[in-house]
């Protein structure tokens, strides 16, 4: 893999509900490596179930273990590659349109626009015990079942996950931001 990065356009099934979910994604030793790191506007949440992956986020490199959750921030160059075992994980990609509110609303000003503009970046490796895993598991279930009003449930779970990240100081500020 070279040091160049390539823009990755993320397709969504429904443009009105811009979330993409890849459940039980598998990467094997035979999966071809990407030519370059990629980036996109969407926030990406990776939840690892088995095996291990080599995750690159910007200049940081990680080797995953089952149960871990990783965040790829908007516009962050990244890659996920096979490292060992039977690698199975879920990938959630949420476009900024899914979590934006009204332009002058307090949550939009204090959090959502700050995330999109990279003034707030989440730590890539997230504690995988307890609440974050429960939120992601529920989000995956709601999206898969697609019961009435599932869009509201999924959106609320994404916001709940961001609230957990923000409340537990799972962020790294890229610039000084006053709220």
PLM segments and residue spans:
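Generic protein-terminus/edge-of-domain signal
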Residues: 1-68, 108-110, 120
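Short, Lys/Arg-enriched, Trp-marked, Pro/Gly-tolerant hinge/linker segments that flank
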Residues: 120-128, 143-157, 163-179
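A hydrophobic/aromatic-rich effector-binding and dimerization subdomain
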Residues: 2-21, 25, 81-141, 167
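A conserved hydrophobic position in a structured secondary element of the catalytic/binding core
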Residues: 72-73, 94
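Amphipathic, well-ordered alpha-helical segments in soluble domains
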Residues: 44-47, 131-135, 157, 164
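Hydrophobic beta-strand core residues of beta-sandwich domains
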Residues: 64, 70-72, 126
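Residue-level recognition of hydrophobic positions within alpha-helical transmembrane segments
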Residues: 38-40, 138, 156
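Short beta-strand His + acidic residue motifs that chelate non-heme Fe in jelly-roll/DSBH
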Residues: 55-56, 72, 78-85
């Amino acid at each position: 893999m070279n040091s160049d990065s390539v823009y990755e356009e993320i397709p969504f099934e429904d443009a009105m509900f811009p979330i993409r979910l890849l459940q039980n994604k598998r990467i094997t030793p035979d999966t071809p490596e990407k030519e370059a790191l990629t980036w996109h506007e969407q926030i990406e949440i990776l939840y690892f179930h088995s095996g291990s992956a080599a995750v690159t986020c910007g200049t940081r490199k990680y080797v995953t273990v089952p149960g871990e959750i990783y965040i790829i921030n908007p516009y962050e160059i990244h890659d996920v590659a096979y490292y060992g075992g039977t690698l199975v994980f879920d990938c959630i990609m949420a476009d900024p349109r899914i979590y934006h509110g009204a332009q002058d609303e307090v949550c939009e000003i204090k959090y959502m626009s700050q995330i999109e503009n990279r003034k707030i970046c989440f730590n890539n490796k997230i504690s995988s015990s307890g609440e974050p895993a429960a939120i992601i598991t529920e989000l995956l279930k709601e999206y898969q079942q697609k019961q009435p009003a599932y869009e509201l449930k999924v959106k609320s779970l994404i916001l709940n996950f961001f609230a957990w990240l923000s409340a537990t100081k799972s962020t790294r500020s890229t610039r000084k931001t006053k709220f």
